[in-house]
Amino acid sequence: MKNSIRTAVIICFAFLGALPLRGQELSLEIPLWATPPTENNGLTGPETKVGSKGFTANVSYPVLKVYRADAARNTGTAVLIAPGGGYGALAMRQEGDPFAAWLAGQGITGVVLKYRMPNGHHRIPLEDAKQGMRLIREHAREWQIDTARIGVMGFSAGGHLAATLLTRYEATSRPAFGILFYPVISFDDRWAHRGSVQNLLGADSTETMKTYYSNELQVTPQTPPTLLLLSNNDGTVKPRNSIMFYEALRENRVLTALYIFPSGGHGCKSRLIRFID
């Protein structure tokens, strides 16, 4: 367990200090499901780019984008990466591909999970995340990955998905560790990111379902070691989300670390590292 959190810390702080990002090219892209999954998200039409940052919306066809580790530096570690976007779109270009490419250059296989948007079908993202972990395990020998060193990383709403996987995994989809950047954790009205709640739960936004998806309430002693990173002045996802998850991990004697940067707001690396300058 200590090795897992040590690996997570090294990954994150090496990444935060690496400017500009350089890494490996995309190795392959594979369908997440060999046959269409049972539950459909009800979205029709092609994927679209939305907003000034070009997030990917209307995602109904999930894939894994695999950036294999530099062979000369391969550590045997792999990370499944869940970009954020409020469960309504995916920040693939900000919180997916660049990070995976950089990890691969450091000897860590980066696997970007392009998961389906739930559109109120709340089970869909977690099922995609579990399947992503299973596929990495299935290809472990081919991709030269140690099955005991497969972790999950998530940003914002992708952090909520990663935290849900960390607390609701099955034997075939258990992460060795978690790395959560400014994650949505709680669906409690006092702390929740409302857009994420609405997009994930839709009309099923009952108090029972909000409790079910409040991941600070789902931690057990079997939750994998987890590292959390965020900015103190995040105005999009309240810092209390990460603090509650950290406290729950400590109460359950799960190895954990929490880093709160003094500034940076809500967003990826370029903002988080401002305090270093």
Task: Give, region by region, the residue ranges found by the protein language model.
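Primarily recognizes the serine-hydrolase "nucleophile elbow" in alpha/beta-hydrolase
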Residues: 131-196, 210-211, 215
